[in-house]
Amino acid sequence: KNIVEKNSFRRSNYFEFIESECLHVAEHVGLLDMSAFAKCSVTGPNAEGWLNSVVANVVPKSVGRIGLCHMLSKNGGVRAEFTIYKRSENNYYLVFAGSQERHDWDYLKKLAPSDGSVTVQKITSQLGVLVLAGPKSREVLQSLTDTDLGNDNFKWLSGKTINVGYAQAEALRVNFIGELGWELHHPIEM
């Protein structure tokens, strides 16, 4: 159909198409491009200690684990929200709202120690993010990788580097869609 959007304070005439997409993901599987997420790495001998000093939740202690952590204001309000993935010892990967990148990045840089114990690097433009979500997402992704994606091997809130076809991606078993799914973080060149 060739649809011309009609502005309205009610449901737009695009509603049926959006509804169809949402239902398909909820009942089957869908692929979403979330490359607009902001991304940075936090590395160095004091990476874990520093992150624990700037977010309210405890950052992941084990390699391969993911935590949802919030940076709070002095009054206890939420200043920022980060998905924090522990890639390796002293190496963390932070994912946060693309619309807040400038704001959140500013706070991270201002709070970073100047003694060289922590390096905070913006890597948003280096990595893309594809979200594969829905009840059939495991089946689709399993057909593209030799990594066992079963619950025992790939737990909720965990991540690992996997082969996807002929490429590699960091697969994070987390998403905010409310269905089974993975975020596939990959080099833009992939």
Question: Which role does the model predict for each range below?
Answer:
Residues 1-190:
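Glycine/proline-enriched, intrinsically flexible loops and inter-domain linkers
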